[in-house]
Curated annotation (Swiss-Prot):
GO terms for molecular function: metal ion binding; peptide deformylase activity. It is an enzyme of class 3 (hydrolase). InterPro entries: Peptide_deformylase (IPR023635), Peptide_deformylase_sf (IPR036821). Binds 1 Fe(2+) ion. Keywords: Hydrolase, Iron, Metal-binding, Protein biosynthesis. The active site is at residue 152. Removes the formyl group from the N-terminal Met of newly synthesized proteins. Requires at least a dipeptide for an efficient rate of reaction. N-terminal L-methionine is a prerequisite for activity but the enzyme has broad specificity at other positions. This is Peptide deformylase 2. It comes from Shewanella oneidensis (strain ATCC 700550 / JCM 31522 / CIP 106686 / LMG 19005 / NCIMB 14063 / MR-1). Gene3D superfamilies: Peptide deformylase. Its EC number is 3.5.1.88. GO terms for biological process: co-translational protein modification; translation. Its cofactor is Fe(2+). SUPFAM superfamilies: Peptide deformylase.
Length: 181
């Protein structure tokens, strides 16, 4: 059904999965085919993200099991102070290194509508991923951009913002008011 919907409307936004839907609990599967279908999915994901005023979206959020997400930080109603970046399609991502320095930030999620949570995350990460052509890329990301990457990466692990906010380390840091070293 998902591929049929993609073929019928190549640039139309896709429906966004919300908390409680099984796809959001599943581990994403590795992308092996870097073809027009993948590019089309990325295009529709981008349209879905823009329509929902997001700064990122993961394939499971549009009912696809693939290990793929898009980051496109830009100031908008939900994130007025977001830095501006060109949209980046991230395929088969890996977080290679996480800094010990943590920072808290407010996050929302297209799959947890109307809610915001304060989440602690590593301030800097080193990542590895493939682009739409299948070429491996390496980057060091900091601040808000690192936060987006980690948030979307969580979706590929079957973790939504709601689950992340309930993890013991989040509760401990909230009680302490500072990151644990």
């Amino acid at each position: 059904m998902f591929k049929d919907e993609m073929r019928q409307t190549p640039n139309k936004p896709l429906p966004i999965a919300v908390v409680g839907e099984a796809i959001l609990k599943q581990q994403a599967i590795e992308v092996r085919d870097f073809d027009d279908t993948l590019s089309q999915l990325a295009s529709q994901m981008a349209a879905s993200m823009v329509e929902a005023k997001g700064v990122g979206i993961a394939a499971p959020q549009v009912h696809s099991p693939l290990a793929l997400f898009i980051m496109a930080s830009r100031p908008n109603e939900r994130y007025p102070d977001a830095p501006l970046m060109e949209p980046l399609v991230v395929v088969n991502p890996q977080i290679v290194l996480r800094s010990l320095q943590l920072e808290k930030g407010e996050e929302g999620c297209l799959s947890v509508p109307g809610q915001r949570f304060t989440i602690w995350r590593p301030q800097t990460i080193v990542v590895r991923y493939q682009n739409l052509a299948g070429q491996w890329q390496h980057s060091e990301l900091t601040g808000f951009i690192a936060r987006i990457f980690q948030h979307e990466f969580d979706h590929l692990q079957g973790i939504t913002l709601l689950e992340r906010s309930q993890m013991p380390e989040q509760k401990l840091m909230a009680q302490e008011g500072k990151p644990q070293a």
